[in-house]
């Protein structure tokens, strides 16, 4: 289920922007049954910004909670490759097989819809709210 969509505008090298990112990572959600849910894992793309910023936030939030990732456009590469050891910066820099991930996601999005209360393996569920796509 897609639970939320958060867009954080600002410069990634400014602490004020990073504090808003921290708030999004630490946000709590309430399930319909009252159970509190937190975000247990975040992948943060290092492309396009100084990777050191992402590495520092990974260390701040926990190296297994915030995973720095970089794309690898190699057909057939696994969706994500978790290294066995930390890199020189002390974090686990994961590679994302972007072509493979897109192929899997697009295939799952083509699946016939099922009722929301019906358990469906590997289903992607979006809210019934057109604003989520804007």
Feature locations, PLM:
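Mg2+-dependent endonuclease catalytic cores in nucleic-acid-processing enzymes, primarily RNase H-like
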Residues: 2-133
């Amino acid at each position: 289920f897609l639970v939320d969509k958060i867009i954080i505008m600002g410069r990634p090298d400014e602490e004020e922007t990073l504090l808003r990112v921290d708030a999004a990572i630490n946000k709590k959600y309430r399930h319909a049954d009252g159970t509190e849910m937190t975000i247990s894992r975040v992948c943060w793309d290092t492309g396009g910004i100084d990777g050191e910023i992402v590495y520092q936030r990974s260390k701040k939030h926990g190296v297994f909670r915030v995973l720095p990732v970089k794309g690898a456009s190699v057909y057939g590469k696994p969706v994500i490759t978790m290294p066995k050891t930390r890199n020189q910066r002390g974090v686990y820099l994961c590679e994302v097989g972007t072509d493979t991930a897109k192929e899997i996601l697009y295939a799952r999005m083509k699946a016939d819809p099922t009722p929301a209360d019906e358990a469906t393996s590997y289903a992607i569920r979006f809210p019934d709210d057109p604003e989520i796509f804007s």
